[in-house]
Each structure stands twice: as C-alpha cells, then as structure tokens.
Amino acid sequence: MKILMISNHLGVQSGVQRYVQNLLLHLDTAKYRVTLFVGQCPPDQASTAPALEAHGVEILAVPDNKKDRIRALAAHLRTHKDYDIIHYHTASKIGAPVCGMMRVLCPRAKIIVHSHIVYPPMTLTWRAAHLVYRLFADYFLGCGVAAGRFVFGDHIDDKPNFSVACNAVDAGRFHPDAAARAATRAAWGITDTDRLAGFVGRLNHQKNPLFLMEVFAAMAAQDPHWKLLLVGTGEM
C-alpha cells in the first residue's frame, strides 16, 4: 500500500511534525510504503528527517512556503497517481481547495484530512472551506472534537467517517525517578514544602498559557506554597 503523508515542515518544534514522526516510526514501512511531502526544516531547528529516513520513510522536502509547496505538490501528483491513501495534515482554509486539487490529480486515492487547530473567530470563508473539505475528502480526523468542528464544520463529529486521533505520548519513556526529582527541585529552588504545578509544551496561542496563568494565580492565592514550572519555548 502506498501512502502520501503531507505535513508542514521537518522541524522538531512543530507539534504536527512531532505527531507525524511518532506515527510513522510505529508504522511497518515494509508493508506500507510511505512518502512524506513536507516543508524543509527551518534553519534554527533540528530535523526529524534522519530518524524517519532510517525507518524507511521517503521524504520529499520542498521550500517551506505555502505557494511553493502547493505548486510542488501539484507537480508531484501529476506524475504519481498511484497512491492508495493521501493523509493531509491541515490547519488552514487554503487546505480546502488543495484537497480538491488532490482529488482531481489522484482520483483513486482515499483522502484523509486531519485538523490540528482551533483558531477563532469563525468566518464566512471558513464556512465555505468546510463545504469544500467535505465535498472532496473521504475521512476526517481531529486532534480533538473542537479541532474537527473548526476546520470541517459544526456537526462533523456526528459523521461515521470522523474520528478523534489523540496526540499519543509513549508513556514507557516516563517513570518516577526520585533522584532526578530531587536534583531538579534543588536546581530550581523548590523546597520540600513547596507544591509544584508543571506545564510542558509550546508557549503559543493554541496552548492557552494566559488562562494557565489565571488558574495558577487562583491556586497561589489559596496556598502560597504553589509554584509553577513552565518547560518550553514559543511565540509568547
């Protein structure tokens, strides 16, 4: 079976690309021939490409620019019409006509569109995009119900061809470690009487860190022993 996976870029700081990497590294690439069509890695980030290529994933890296990527995708599909599945990770309105383009150029493929975003406000253009996505795609995924509704329409979760695809974490990589815990708390001046709340993730709009600060302020007002540790970087 031949699969074309379409992601944003190869950088490790991309939440979408990390999801793609986790997914593909657990896929049997002897059974499923996977081509990853993706933007080039930003110069300030490490690339996910080495691990994916070592696992047998073919990577087609193109300029990390929307217009250039769309042109390159069209050119690729004109000469590669034998994909069984196209899995398209999307977070934009422009993805809707791109979905139509994929249907025209690769008519036998099953098209999966996968939403990773909730970014209000809802506009008339977005509502038009809902109709286009639903006209051309076969299956719909969202990292949550809200993400599915935002990109594909209010009632998409009522459809049998919609599913939530959770951004899974390998729990086996995490386990209690008393020595590491003590060292980390000492390094950050956290005493045995302090209570620690933690956040691990990107500091951007989607993760809603401002609301986290409001919640923490209420917790600290009730008990001054609370401290908040943020692990991550981002636009905010």
Labelled PLM ranges:
Residues 14-22, 195-218, 224, 228, ...:
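A conserved mid-protein helix/loop that constitutes part of the nucleotide-sugar donor-binding site
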Residues 88-96, 115:
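Short His-centered aromatic/hydrophobic patch
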Residues 5-67, 161, 234:
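N-terminal strand-loop element at the rim of the active site
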Residues 50, 54-85, 95-105, 124-135, ...:
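An amphipathic, basic-hydrophobic alpha-helix
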Residues 137-175:
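A short, active-site helix/loop in glycosyltransferases that binds the activated sugar's phosphate group
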Residues 3, 85, 102-119, 141:
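Active-site proximal beta-strand in glycosyltransferases
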Residues 175-190:
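A short helix/loop element that forms part of the nucleotide-sugar donor recognition site in Leloir-type
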Residues 67-71, 110, 117-137, 149-156:
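Nucleotide-sugar donor phosphate/pyrophosphate-binding loop at the beta->alpha transition
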